[in-house]
Regions:
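A generic structural motif
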Residues: 49-50, 120, 323
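N-terminal glycine/serine-rich phosphate-binding loop of ATP-dependent small-molecule kinases
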Residues: 2-115, 162, 223, 245, ...
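Active-site core segments that coordinate phosphate-bearing ligands/cofactors
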Residues: 9-17, 22-23, 89, 127-183, ...
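Short beta-strand-loop/turn "lid" adjacent to the catalytic site in phosphate-handling enzymes
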Residues: 82-119, 139-141, 174-186, 190-195, ...
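Conserved beta-strand -> loop -> alpha-helix junction used to position metal-binding or nucleic-acid-contacting
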Residues: 117-127
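Conserved small-residue
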Residues: 33-35, 40, 95, 122, ...
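Short glycine/proline- and acidic residue-enriched helix-loop micro-motifs
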Residues: 59, 133-137, 225
Length: 537
């Protein structure tokens, strides 16, 4: 992926001359800072572990948690630079901040937080979401910022009249660093719907929302309190003296460093996997799964199963999210490991995964009739309310290890398949390639083949499968400074970041495609059994 490796003296010179780029991302359990050189290589990182709190019925992080975590992740990175290269960071080429999207942060005209920060995990916005979906004829998920704001209005919360600014976590940090009330279009698309032609909030929906709440007589209109939307490559302000001290309380970091538009974790993930071009997709397959498909044009119909966001440069993205992923698969692998230990077999977990996953490829294309569900949590897309892992078979089922493992790999992708079918079959969306990343793809070629057959599309897996969100954010910071006039983000990534790293590609196999379709027919029929288990068991 990266162009060339640097010597230690090269890196020291880059850092001292202020030519390194910094990306910091707030994940739900970890805040990570990644420093890269001019060739996009990560040269240092730092992190801070944190946890959300459940207070007064809401998931939140306190402002103290936010600032302590930011400073600690930066300090950890800076100390690693000092230890590794013997240099103190004073200047940087550019900085970018990213964070988990959505949620609710509302401030008054003095900059005071009016209500506790509500994270994306809060689902107390059902009524608001329902009203807004009906009003806009556009999917507004429970976690979106506009749903949180409208729920506060429905609940007659007193603070709403005093709102002067509402933003996301990344937008808040950026504002405190620069004084600029701006947001990258990808993160903004999780606050309020975006018009892909103007790369700004959808004007028709803005007017509909203002009309919806005009009887409340608030002293603001919705666009007045939302952040200004910027796209990747736009200048988004410079680090102020106050901002520098908030990031680095030691005082070593100097003011005046340019910042790029703050982004959401979905956007940085797309950058890190080289998946921002139209007709491309990336699928993350870990403890939960999600797929993101970059569209050429808006969808024809409203689909509540599909979330609409954008790339950092403003292309429309259809996102399918599955609450469940590899957890049930892992449980079965652990069970077989326990059996191996019980008979005295010396097998490590890598060998166990490799053996069982590869065994799945020996199974029948339709799993021999075995049906399984790996739901550890509820699944809105399939209307399953609770976690009920299940294996079902008939007396005629070909019950063997290969079919058993294959069924569990198949079902792990079941919800993603339902969502992708809406896009490709119902909406006619065309996808050239999918980039797969995450735990499902660690055993070479297995998860990749199953996914290619499931969605009938070529799947590429890179050796690194991307360096993660904070690295993607650092790339966006660098792109703002180093892009040529008119150079698109997708071209910058393709030609200057990822270069010749095309990864390994597996094309769908007609027999496998037909087998997966047969499995999905049974999967859909069996969902009533799964739903009944949520009630009776």
């Amino acid at each position: 992926m990266f162009r060339r490796k640097r010597t230690m003296s090269n890196v020291k010179e880059i850092i001292e001359s202020g030519k390194a780029y910094l990306g910091i991302e707030f994940g739900s359990t970890r805040i990570k800072a990644v420093l890269i050189d001019e060739e996009h290589n990560p040269i240092a990182s730092g992190s801070h572990t944190w946890e959300n709190r459940y207070e007064n019925g809401l998931w939140t992080y306190s402002l103290d948690d936010i600032w302590a975590g930011l400073q600690d992740s930066y300090r950890d990175m800076a100390e690693n630079v000092q230890k590794e290269y013997g240099v103190t960071i004073k200047k940087l080429g550019a900085i970018g901040f990213s964070a988990m999207m959505h949620g609710y942060m509302a401030f008054d005209k003095e900059g005071k937080l009016l209500a506790p920060f509500q994270t994306w995990r809060n689902s107390n916005t059902g009524k608001a979401s329902e009203v807004l979906v009906d009003l806009f004829q556009y999917n507004i998920p429970l976690r979106w910022s506009i749903a949180h704001l409208y729920q506060c209005i429905l609940d007659k919360e007193d603070h709403v009249k005093d709102i002067a600014f509402t933003t996301t976590l990344a937008g808040y940090i950026h504002w405190q660093m620069t004084g600029e009330k701006v947001l990258g279009v990808g993160d903004a698309s999780g606050m309020f719907p975006i018009d892909m032609n103007t790369k700004d909030y959808d004007e028709e929906m803005i007017q509909k929302f203002d009309k919806l709440i005009e009887g409340e007589n608030y002293p603001w209109k919705i666009k007045e309190i939302l952040p200004k939307v910027l796209v990747a490559g736009d200048a988004a302000g410079i680090l102020t003296e106050e901002g520098a001290k908030k990031l680095d309380p030691t005082g070593n970091l100097e003011a005046g460093i340019p910042l790029c538009p703050p982004e959401g974790d979905a956007g940085t993930g797309m950058v890190a996997t080289n998946s921002v071009a139209q007709r491309t997709s990336n699928i993350s397959a870990g403890t939960s799964f999600f797929s993101m498909v970059v569209l050429e044009k808006p969808l024809k119909d409203l689909h509540t199963e599909i979330d609409m966001v954008t790339t950092p440069d403003g292309s429309l993205v259809a996102m399918v999210h599955s609450n469940n992923g590899t957890t049930d698969l892992n449980a079965w692998v652990n069970l077989f490991k326990e059996f191996a230990d019980s008979i005295g077999a010396d097998v490590d977990m890598n060998q166990m995964y490799g053996t069982l996953y590869n065994k799945a490829l020996e199974g029948d294309a339709d799993c021999g009739g075995i049906l399984s569900y790996g739901n550890y949590a509820g699944e809105p897309i399939t209307n399953v309310e609770k976690g009920r892992p299940m294996v079902v078979r008939t007396p005629e089922t070909k019950f063997n290890l290969a079919n058993f493992m294959r069924s569990h790999l198949y079902t792990a992708l079941g919800v993603i398949k339902v969502g992708m079918d809406i896009l490709t079959k119902d909406e006619g969306v065309e996808i050239d390639t999918v980039l797969g990343h995450g735990g499902l793809f660690k055993t070479k070629g297995v998860g990749q083949k199953i996914l290619a057959d499931a969605i009938n599309t070529p799947v590429v897996v890179m050796e690194t499968a991307g360096e993660g969100g904070p690295w993607g954010m650092a790339i966006l910071a660098e792109y703002m400074v180093k892009r040529e006039e008119g150079e698109k983000l997708e071209d910058y990534l393709k030609n200057k970041v990822f270069g010749s790293d095309a990864g390994s590609r597996i094309d769908p196999d007609p027999e496998g495609v037909a087998g997966y379709e047969a499995f999905m027919e049974t999967y859909k029929k069996g969902l009533d059994v799964e739903r009944r288990a949520c009630v009776d068991l």
